[in-house]
Amino acid sequence: GKTMAYLFGALKRSSHVEQEGPTVVSCHTKHLQDQLFYKDLPQLAETMDVPVKAVMMKGRNNYICKTRFDWMIADANTLDEKDMEALLPVMFWLHWTKTGDISECSGFFNSRRTWLKSSFCSEPGFCTGEICNRHRGCYYGQLRQALYRAHTIVVNHSLLLTEADRPGFLPEFNAVVVDEAHNLVKSAYNQFKVEWNEKGTSFLLQGVDPAHPRSMRWNNILQQINEITPGVIQLRDELQDAVKNTQGALKDFMQALRDDNETRFNP
């Protein structure tokens, strides 16, 4: 009931969008975003017999960049067998997706190679109009253009909070509806908190450790670079020693921290 009520108001405002800007609707869950965008908005627009221009938008790293993806699979030497198996569902999914939202591709996430996503998702600095238009483009740029033609913009709380912190991503708007508002404070806490722990730091170090399985891809790239610039492999070995020493120092530091504070916070 309440969903239709605020969407009714949003659609009534659509005739004044040039003067007042679009209506932004923020949700906490992907389920509600999908329900609003794919079911409720079309149903209400048909009932009211009014045209609707709506866009559903998420954070940039949720969208695949076809340029980066093409470049990654073009050089098979940088991928191991498990990497290629994980990317097969993505290749099939690209033939039918209209949004480029990688969360649609459950086969990729079932592969447990989710760190590969950072190698093909849309990225600031890389995904420019000049590069992406030359290589069949990427979905994120198309969505950004559609934002400025939309009457209604459906976002998640994370994106709304990003806009509040660093304005300019969304077009100017004067009306915002926050659905699932009881989750807004929690979303803000998760977004703006600064967190540090041993597990997270160790995981980051593993990403640059040449001896770790997650480093196989860039190890293969270094092997190719070494053929052109001998000596690079020696630097890799030095990095491996440095990471090992840092991991040891991290464990010692965290143990000392626990010893000094365990009785203070756990009497």
Predicted segments — roles?
Residues 11-12, 62:
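Residue-level marker of positions within ordered structural domains that often coincide
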Residues 2-3:
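Conserved lysine of the Walker
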Residues 8-9, 49:
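Conserved P-loop NTPase motor core
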Residues 17-151, 215, 219-226:
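A substrate-engagement module of RecA-like helicase motors
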